[in-house]
From Swiss-Prot:
(Microbial infection) Cleaved by S.pyogenes SpeB protease; leading to its degradation. Degradation by SpeB prevents autophagy, promoting to S.pyogenes intracellular replication. Ubiquitin-binding autophagy adapter that participates in different processes including host defense or intracellular homeostasis. Possesses a double function during the selective autophagy by acting as a shuttle bringing ubiquitinated proteins to autophagosomes and also by participating in the formation of protein aggregates. Plays a role in the regulation of the innate immune response by modulating type I interferon production and targeting ubiquitinated IRF3 for autophagic degradation. Residues 913-957 form the UBA domain. It comes from Homo sapiens (Human). The modification Phosphothreonine is found at T586. This is Next to BRCA1 gene 1 protein.
């Protein structure tokens, strides 16, 4: 909206100000009427002062708009001068002569007086012509009377007629105005009598010369008589003089125009006053409504144009995309030379003509040339039995599932196989020129070899050296001359005779990729009958890649693996021939033929060898009992399993935590002899020491397992395992130790199982009655009857021993194996290893190797030279593992030590030798205490009491950790 302009109008030293807005709301006719009414003038000439203080006349709407533009530049102020014009009264004869000349010249009837009024109203309130003068041409010419003056009777008649027409017109205008006012102000409907009161000379001009406007006051709702105040910005707002003096509900910033009476014509003040009474506000209201309608129309038109513009932009963008796409297609076709006049794919012009105006991007799928095929059916199913030397033709029904017609360059290419061809030189077979979606037959002629056996030949479609589609093959069984076809073989051969038309699984069976061909350069084919290798050069298709082959035709992992095995053992690979089953039931990997003579059924030994890394090995107890016998420690041989570092740590931690839990994963085998020289005291304490010594022996044996990777010993172990296995039973049972019971907290089971078990282990020299591999539960049952070991040293008594020296003892809980489990699963292979030896992966590996049990109190000669060498060889590995573990692992070590050395105190302190000192240092190194000087100083300080040394080291580490963190 334009800014408001103040008009300062001056007339004979009288100045009045008018506040106007844009020229659309307040027109030049409104300004002229307001000026005339304000200064009570009839004929005026308005001039304004421009920038050079020169007077410029205003006589039209355009000049008025220019004046407003000038006022905006002058601070929204416009100085205007009003000059009163002299009204010249037209004399009757000249207009009569002029009117006669007009009538004579035009030959038309002049307008009547009321029509003239209507025309004057439509031309912005211009001064109308004299109606009395125009009425004279209606008088018929009387030849007897002079033409200068009409007769009196005619003049009086016309005056009466004129008054009647004017009254009727004014009444109609008042009625229309009243209807509009009622619509705008419903309160006026209650007083229609006041508004529609019949007008007459007495009501129009009241005494005291007050004019009745026939308009209701917007404030008091009464008819305005006399002075009327109209808002200069809101033409429909009118109030009377009394309301203007008091408060009224309107914007105080709007200037009110004071109107005494409407503008009247100079010749007929009475008629024009009656006419102008209702027309002025009605005209303003109509203009306002029309402008509002125009504004709404313009707004809707702008929105429509804006939407059309957006749509055109989107269309142009889409056309640009399609044009860019067609350019790429044209460039792609021109590069790869598919400009064949017969093929519509080589004509990008036709594509542009047909698809340029298509908004959706549809030509992507139809333009890309794609080679693809699907296997439908065949004539000779896999496993067909033939006589030697039989000449036969293998047919494959193939469907062209791509969008390119097969040409002379499309051939069926030989890949590998040992089935004799009828023509050895013919490695590529022509295929029919199939159109997209058509089905055809591809045939190859073979000759059955002379020797009996299974023969195969693998083929694949190729276009200009680029392979595509599924791999097809022919697999037959050549019988000996005395045909011995059993019903089983016939049934096996006919299992996969039904075929269906599908593509997915058969394409997953594809064996060879063009990429593989480019990398290898040639494919080795080997026939079983001639035993000759015929290298075939594959075509280099890198420079001639013209057609797109979908990814579903690429080779699977099974095919790549089979291709790598092809050069290693072609005979064995040729026996693993998949059946030509229909594509919807083809297995994901090639099945083995039921009658293959070269592939043995994988036995327990192979399965055991494959599962050896995962650690899931066990044996049924029937085989274990065969090998279980009392063997002397001094006469056993070495046969150890190779373990990785991670498995060794897992096993060591589990063994240190669970001495009574589960069997070893190795079968009972010959054991390593250990030479140890020490004196064992008699009694329960001696048995406990003896068990600890056996634990040290076990760790030495474990070191031997890790260091000696002898293939002969591994084979011997495997043979031993296989000899104990059963052909009918290949189930594996894994008994997890007590520490894996997730329903119990770690404090209940983890450390309690780390205690010694003197009732379960014996030295082989003095007590050969109890086998080394016996289960803890069984040993507990046998001890009271068959052994002299006291009952109070059973596992229950050991479990009830406090593991932390001050806490409440544990409640003994000995769980026997269920009857369904083996009575004695694969037993341990060391005397001192009753714990679990399963390499089960543990989420948090404890840093407590079971070498910590090598130095109990009261033992005189505990560690031999082999233990020393083992500790030295392992301490670097143990320190590297313990260096990455957290404080919780150290607390586990301390708790295990407390549980280990919770036995009865010994008064006599043994003399510590240099080897024993080195062993203690190695223990500390494996637990992560790598400060040699500090360890040696603490050992001397605590008189080689490793429990006190570990406790003080833990306190030092905790203090250092807190000081560094906080």
């Amino acid at each position: 909206m334009e800014p408001q302009v103040t008009l300062n109008v001056t007339f004979k030293n009288e100045i009045q100000s008018f506040l106007v807005s844009d020229p659309e709301n307040t027109t030049w006719a409104d300004i002229e009427a307001m000026v005339k009414v304000s200064f009570d003038l009839n004929t005026i000439q308005i001039k304004y002062l421009d920038e050079e203080n020169e007077e410029v006349s205003i006589n039209s709407q355009g000049e008025y708009e220019e004046a407003l533009k000038m006022a905006v530049k002058q601070g929204n102020q416009l100085q205007m001068q009003v000059h009163e014009g002299h009204h010249v009264v037209d004399e009757a004869p000249p207009p009569v002569v002029g009117a006669k000349r007009l009538a004579a010249r035009a030959g038309k009837k002049p307008l009547a007086h009321y029509s003239s009024l209507v025309r004057v109203l439509g031309s912005d309130m211009k001064t109308p012509e004299d109606p009395a003068v125009q009425s004279f041409p209606l008088v018929p010419c009387d030849t007897d009377q002079p033409q200068d003056k009409p007769p009196d009777w005619f003049t009086s008649y016309l005056e009466t007629f004129r008054e009647q027409v004017v009254n009727e017109t004014v009444e109609k205008l008042e009625q229309k105005l009243h209807e509009k006012l009622v619509l705008q102000n419903p309160s006026l409907g209650s007083c229609p009598s006041e508004v529609s009161m019949p007008t007459s000379e007495e009501t129009l001009f009241l005494p005291e010369n007050q004019f009745s406007w026939h308009i209701a006051c917007n404030n008091c709702q009464r008819r305005i008589v006399g002075v009327r105040y109209q808002c200069s910005l809101c033409p429909s707002y009118n109030i009377c003089e009394d309301c203007e003096a008091g408060p009224y509900g309107h914007d105080t910033n709007h200037v009110l125009l004071k109107l005494r009476r409407p503008v009247v014509g100079s010749s007929e003040p009475f008629c024009h006053s009656k006419y102008s009474t209702p027309r002025l506000p009605a005209a303003l209201e109509q203009v306002r409504l029309q402008k509002q309608v125009d504004k709404n129309f313009l707004k809707a038109e702008k929105q429509r144009l804006r939407a059309e513009k957006k749509q055109r932009k989107a269309e142009v963008k889409e056309l640009k995309k399609q044009l860019k796409l067609h350019r790429k297609i044209h460039l792609w076709n021109s590069i790869h030379g598919l400009q064949s006049p017969k093929s519509p794919l080589g004509r990008p012009e036709s594509l542009l003509q047909s698809n340029t105006l298509m908004l959706p991007l549809q030509p992507c799928t139809s333009v890309m040339p794609m080679l693809s095929a699907a296997f439908v059916d065949e004539n000779l199913p896999d496993g067909t039995h033939l006589q030697p030397g039989t000449k036969f033709i293998k047919h494959w029904r193939m469907k062209n599932t791509g969008n390119v017609k097969w040409s002379a360059d499309t051939k069926l290419k030989f890949m590998w196989g040992n089935l004799t061809l009828a023509s050895t030189e013919k490695k590529d077979v022509l295929v029919p020129c199939l159109k997209a979606g058509h089905v055809g037959v591809v045939s190859v002629e073979f000759i059955a070899p002379a020797l009996e056996g299974t023969y195969t030949s693998h083929w694949r479609l190729s276009h200009k050296g680029q392979q595509f589609g599924p791999r097809v093959w022919c697999s037959i069984i050549v019988d000996p001359f005395p045909s011995e076809e059993s019903p089983d073989n016939i049934e096996k051969g006919m299992i996969s005779s039904s075929k269906t038309d599908d593509l997915t699984c058969q394409q997953e069976e594809t064996f060879l990729l063009a990429k593989e061909e480019r990398q290898l350069g040639e494919v080795t084919e080997q026939t079983e009958g001639t035993a000759a290798c015929i290298p075939q050069k594959a075509k280099n298709v890198a420079s001639e890649r013209e057609l797109y082959i979908p990814s579903v035709d690429l080779l699977t992992a099974q095919d790549l693996l089979s291709f790598e095995l092809l050069d290693i053992n072609i005979v064995q690979e040729l026996e693993r021939v998949p059946h030509n089953t229909p594509v919807d039931v083809t297995p994901c990997m090639s099945p083995l033929p039921h009658d293959s003579p070269l592939i043995e059924k994988p036995g327990l030994g192979q399965i055991e060898e494959e599962n050896e890394g995962a650690g899931f090995k066990a044996l049924p107890d029937s085989m274990v009992s065969v090998k279980r016998k009392a063997e002397n420690i001094a006469s056993v041989e070495e046969a150890e399993e190779d373990l990785s570092g991670t498995q060794f740590v897992c096993e060591t931690v589990i063994r240190s935590l669970t001495l009574d839990a589960a069997p070893d994963h190795n079968p009972p085998c010959r054991q390593k002899s250990l030479q140890m020289t020490f004196a064992l005291p008699e009694g329960p304490l001696g048995n406990e020491k003896e068990e600890i010594i056996h634990i040290a022996e076990e760790e030495a044996v474990m070191e031997e397992e890790e260091d000696e990777e002898d293939e002969e010993e591994e084979d011997e172990l495997k043979d031993e395992v296989q000899s104990q296995s059963s052909a009918s039973s290949e189930d594996y049972i894994i008994i997890l130790p007590e520490c894996f019971d997730t329903s119990r907290p770690l404090g209940d089971s983890m450390y309690s199982s780390a205690l010694s078990q003197p009732g379960l282990e014996r030295g082989a020299e003095g007590k050969p009655g109890v086998e080394a591999g016996q289960e803890p539960a069984e040993a507990g049952e046998r001890l009271p009857g068959g052994e002299n070991q006291p009952q109070e040293h059973s596992i229950s008594d050991i479990l009830t021993t406090s593991q932390t020296l001050e806490t409440v003892p544990l409640i003994p809980e000995v769980v026997e194996l269920p009857p369904s489990l083996p009575r004695s699963s694969p037993c341990v292979h060391h005397h001192g290893s009753p714990g679990v030896d399963l390499p089960v992966t543990i989420p948090e590996v404890s840093s407590v190797p079971d070498q910590i049990r090598g130095e109990p109190r009261g033992s005189s000669g505990l560690v031999n030279s082999r233990q020393k060498s083992y500790d030295h060889s392992r301490h670097h590995h143990g320190s590297s593992i313990a260096g990455g573990l957290v404080k919780g692992a150290l607390s586990v070590a301390a708790s295990a030590y407390k549980a280990l050395f919770a036995g009865p105190p010994v008064t006599a302190q043994p003399i510590i030798s240099e080897d024993q000192t080195a062993a203690l240092m190695a223990h500390l190194f494996e637990m992560g205490f790598c400060d040699r000087q500090l360890n040696l100083r603490l050992l001397k300080k605590h008189n080689y009491n490793i429990l006190q040394v570990v406790t003080e080291l833990l306190q030092l580490n905790n203090n250092d950790w807190y000081s560094q963190r906080y």
